[in-house]
Amino acid sequence: MAAAAASRGIGAKLGLREIRIHLCQRSPGSQGVRDFIEKRYVELKKANPDLPILIRECSDVQPKLWARYAFGQEKNVPLNNFSADQVTRALENVLSGKA
């Protein structure tokens, strides 16, 4: 069902199946990612209700954006020391196939 929905929404032409965001709850390098989640996650999820968007918190992990596509292909973008706006641009690039 999520795969069918992803085929109609963002990243549809690329076969996007899932977005994962890894971050640390406390590190300064993850602050922009935490800000992004607080300010923009709800809007992103409302616009894409059937696309799995997973948030994974882990102590001392480097913040990273993962996108999983059809046939198990994955791309990742490091988000260390990014601002919330830079995280937004990184997500847009992944969704458009530029990353």
Curated annotation (Swiss-Prot):
Membrane-related topology note: Peripheral membrane protein
List of residues that carry N6-succinyllysine: 64
Cellular component, GO annotation: mitochondrial inner membrane; respiratory chain complex I
Compartments in which it is found: Mitochondrion inner membrane
First-listed, main subcellular location of the protein, grouped into a coarse class: mitochondrion
Protein role: Accessory subunit of the mitochondrial membrane respiratory chain NADH dehydrogenase (Complex I), that is believed not to be involved in catalysis. Complex I functions in the transfer of electrons from NADH to the respiratory chain. The immediate electron acceptor for the enzyme is believed to be ubiquinone.
Record-stated family: Belongs to the complex I NDUFA2 subunit family.
Subunit details: Complex I is composed of 45 different subunits.
Name of the protein: NADH dehydrogenase [ubiquinone] 1 alpha subcomplex subunit 2
Native organism: Macaca fascicularis
